[in-house]
Amino acid sequence: MRLPIFLDTDPGIDDAVAIAAAIFAPELDLQLMTTVAGNVSVEKTTRNALQLLHFWNAEIPLAQGAAVPLVRAPRNAASVHGESGMAGYDFVEHNRSPLDKPAFLAIRDALMRAPEPVTLVAIGPLTNIALLLSQCPECKQYIRRLVIMGGSAGRGNCTPNAEFNIAADPEAAACVFRSGIEIVMCGLDVTNQAILTPDYLATLPELNRTGKMLHALFSHYRSGSMQSGLRMHDLCAIAWLVRPDLFTLKPCFVAVETQGEFTSGTTVVDIDGCLSKPANVQVALDLDVKGFQQWVAEVLALAS
């Protein structure tokens, strides 16, 4: 039976690969997409998500989400993804539009209609998820688990210690991590290992229309290079859903620093139990890289 999922995203070039996998992996049933400000503004992430859905002729409802973090000024990652968020490919015009409700209410309504608890996947800042949990706490019982791309048990990529998705809205992340829902965290500890090799990247233009499109986007992606390999951060959250055997997880207490002058946005991952607090997150710490690369090749071959 296919696993029903809702995907919260901020496309973003590596988001595009994750969305492809969520749509075409035969094990998954992508029922709702929502957008959030992150890599670029929410207007741009929404436009990009709609372009991708149209490209794949995917009839999946999409709702636009939060334009700004809960309390902070917005930041972005245009230096990594380009000013549009998905530079490099000319998508055809379409007349699709988002639902006439904000993302957190769209998630709430879809959860309440679902016949069974649903897995949420968040591969951008956690603003929409925090709004859902704070404004609609009755929804917790309908969430099977939350799988995120975000955080790190070690070094950051936005500050010395903070990963971008968490640092973009630390207060939202703190709310989510305190919520009591089951969380799987695919952070930089694994996503920095999730590299598509130059040899594989070179095959994409001949793979199918998706491969050609992604190859064009990748030429503008700055998380690695076409010559050294590209890191597929967001794709790890989708990969865990389908192939959890590729990941090594450890239950840990995780908190989000919101006050530090230099450490705001850091995920404090208590790997050794120093704080004597109960684990609230399953933290991915290692990845079978060869197995991941093989799975990516298999799922993108289906993305026609």
Swiss-Prot record:
PROSITE patterns: IUNH
GO terms under biological process: purine nucleobase metabolic process; purine nucleoside catabolic process; pyrimidine nucleobase metabolic process
Stored Gene3D superfamilies: Ribonucleoside hydrolase-like
Example GO molecular function: uridine nucleosidase activity
Enzyme class: hydrolase
A GO CC term attached to the entry: cytosol
Known EC number: 3.2.-.-
Highest rank taxon of the organism: Bacteria
UniProt keyword annotations, A-Z: Glycosidase, Hydrolase
Pfam families: IU_nuc_hydro
Catalytic residue positions: 233
InterPro entries on file: I/U_nuclsd_hydro_CS, Inosine/uridine_hydrolase_dom, IUNH, Nucleosid_hydro_RihC_nonspecif, Ribo_hydro-like
Recorded family membership: Belongs to the IUNH family. RihC subfamily.
Summary of the function given for this chain in its UniProt record: Hydrolyzes both purine and pyrimidine ribonucleosides with a broad-substrate specificity.
Designated name of the protein: Non-specific ribonucleoside hydrolase RihC
